[in-house]
Regions:
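Non-catalytic regulatory appendages
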Residues: 1-285
Length: 285
């Protein structure tokens, strides 16, 4: 019996604890394990496997999540390595390039001016080290709504692809980072309110806007005219690990939130709980 299912059996049968979600990083072994359960997702019809029937409670699924802080870092890393020329990636979407130099330009311009457009961004965000590349805060601040607004308002249209990417990732992170019942009130940010309704507009945004953004981006690369090799086209997009993780997590949070609210199991849902911080803190002692 696989170790995963042995753990589920102990929790379900011995401890009487329903297993609803499992979270992991995007390691190839984890993604391969999830794909092995494609026949157990009850024909979800999605591009990735994001749920599996719970063999110890067949009336329930176990939803599969990629760790959201990890996804933010890998998405930022994709943009960090994206530039025109000799680089590992040159991201492109519907006629616009998504380049790290666009964010660097904000930081450099702010350094030359007396008044900063984006006080939170600094060289620490753009000149990554072995330590800073692991910092979730730096990734989230670089791919923020503020960065998006600055690019759209003060910089040329050729930066707007990067701006839209930042906006999409920032909204995704907010939707998956609801931590308490009061944080939205303290920060005056409705995106951080607890989920209390299956018709929450954030769930609709994930399904109708965010997932469509990724799908349209990929399609624009496939349809891009020109003699590009398969490798060249892969460089225009996110890494496979990041793309599958975003799809899997978005689909999972939509369904599991509706499940928990509709079954009366929870009065509200805090999506920040769907990460592996607790495990990392425990084993990091």
């Amino acid at each position: 019996m696989p170790l995963f299912w042995k753990a589920v059996s102990i929790l379900e049968l011995t401890c009487n604890l329903p297993v609803i979600v499992t979270v992991s990083d995007g390691a190839s072994a984890n993604r391969k394990f999830y794909r092995m359960h494609a026949a157990m997702d009850n024909n979800a019809g999605k591009a990735v496997v994001y749920r599996t029937m719970n063999v110890y409670a067949p009336d329930r699924y176990i939803w599969l999540f990629a760790d959201v802080p990890h996804l933010m870092k890998t998405a930022r890393n994709c943009l960090y390595h994206s530039s025109i020329g000799a680089s590992t990636r040159c991201m492109w979407n519907d006629g616009k390039y998504l380049l790290w130099q666009h964010i660097c330009k904000i930081v450099n311009d702010d350094a030359e001016n007396g008044l900063k457009l984006c006080p939170k961004l600094s060289n620490e965000h753009t000149q990554l080290t072995a330590y800073s590349v692991m910092n979730v805060r730096l990734a989230a601040q670089a791919l923020s709504e503020t960065t998006s607004k600055i690019l759209k308002e003060y910089y040329p249209p050729d930066t707007h692809g990067t701006a839209e990417f930042c906006l999409q990732l920032d909204t995704f992170f907010d939707a998956l980072n609801v931590r308490s019942r009061r944080e939205a009130e303290f920060k005056r940010k409705d995106a951080l309110k607890p989920y209390t309704s299956i018709d929450d507009e954030r769930l609709q945004w994930l399904e109708n806007t965010f997932l469509k953004y990724l799908e349209d981006w990929k399609k624009s690369i496939v349809d891009r005219p020109g003699e590009f090799s398969k490798t060249d086209r892969q460089k225009m997009f996110l890494s496979l690990q990041t793309y599958e993780g975003l799809q899997m997590t978005a689909n999972s949070v939509i369904e599991v939130t509706k499940f928990l609210l509709s079954k009366g199991m929870m009065a509200f849902v805090l999506t920040n709980r769907f990460n592996q911080d607790v495990v990392e803190e425990y084993f990091g002692r």
